[in-house]
């Protein structure tokens, strides 16, 4: 099993940062069929082969995920796409 751990700084107010994470989750649900739910300031997400979360904190967020065997082959492209979306939504 492979894992992803990405930390990203941001300067958005909490409500705006949470809204941006929600928009990303909505897009992932639509595009890849992920299921997600909020627990406090943590968005948990799951899909066949992927289990992860986005922890939202003041001035930063952290994306962690465990990839199943088949998804591990795509770790590089998945990380690159996560970083691209974070830069787009939260500045880089």
Predicted segments with their positions:
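C-terminal structural segments of small proteins and small subunits
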Residues: 5-7, 60-92
């Amino acid at each position: 099993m492979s894992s992803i751990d990405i930390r990203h700084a941001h300067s958005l107010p909490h409500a705006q940062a949470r809204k941006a994470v929600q928009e990303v989750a909505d897009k992932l649900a639509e595009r890849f069929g992920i299921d997600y739910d909020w627990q406090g300031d943590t968005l948990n997400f799951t899909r066949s082969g992927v289990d992860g979360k986005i922890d939202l904190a003041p001035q930063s967020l952290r994306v962690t995920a465990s990839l199943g065997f088949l998804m591990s082959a795509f770790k590089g492209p998945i990380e690159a796409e996560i970083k691209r979306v974070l830069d787009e939504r939260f500045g880089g």
